[in-house]
Regions:
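Beta-rich, blade/repeat-based domains predominating
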Residues: 83-84
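Short, solvent-exposed aromatic-acidic interface loops
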Residues: 61-66, 138
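Core segments of cupin and vicinal oxygen chelate
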Residues: 11-63
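Short, P/G- and charge-enriched loop/turn segments at secondary-structure junctions
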Residues: 73-78
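Alpha-helix N-cap/helix-start capping motif
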Residues: 16, 95-96
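A short, polar/proline- and glycine-enriched secondary-structure boundary/capping micro-motif
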Residues: 67-72
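Vicinal oxygen chelate
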Residues: 1, 9-10, 34-35, 43-48, ...
Length: 138
């Protein structure tokens, strides 16, 4: 049987920029940063929340040929930039306080904290355009 969800991948336009955003601004920690020469210098870059060692977010560069042809790569870049290539949800104990903290670190929010039927949430994007929500459930 399946045991845990260990990795979630998101597309990023610039892995170094994404790493700085997720670690410096959001407070995640670096887990892996490995270059694999046998795979065309593919960079395996993961971050995760402190205290959750079994779950990681993989910051994936959008590959070109032979993985994706140029047109497919361009479409993925465009969808990611629009926030339409998936998204992330983080939970928080205090959405409003976390909003203020992240805003002070330079996170650009697309939605301020607001009351929802399930709790309080707010939204922002990473530098690549990925849509991220943080939720305080009630």
């Amino acid at each position: 049987m399946l045991k845990n969800l260990s990795h979630v991948n998101i597309w990023v336009h610039d892995q170094d920029e994404a790493l700085a955003f997720y670690t410096d601004k959001l407070g995640l920690e670096l887990r892996d940063d490995v270059t694999l020469p046998e795979m065309g210098n593919f960079r395996w870059l993961t971050v995760g929340l402190p205290g959750q060692p079994d779950a990681a977010l993989t910051l994936m560069a959008i590959p070109g040929p032979p993985v994706f042809d140029a047109d497919t790569r361009k479409k993925i870049e465009e969808l990611t930039a629009k926030g339409a290539a998936g998204g992330l949800f983080f939970s928080t104990d205090d959405c409003r306080a976390t909003y203020e903290e992240l805003k002070s670190r330079g996170v650009d929010f697309t939605e301020e904290p607001s009351e929802r039927p399930y709790g309080i949430d707010a939204a922002f994007r990473d530098p690549s355009g990925n849509h991220i929500r943080m939720v305080q459930t009630t």
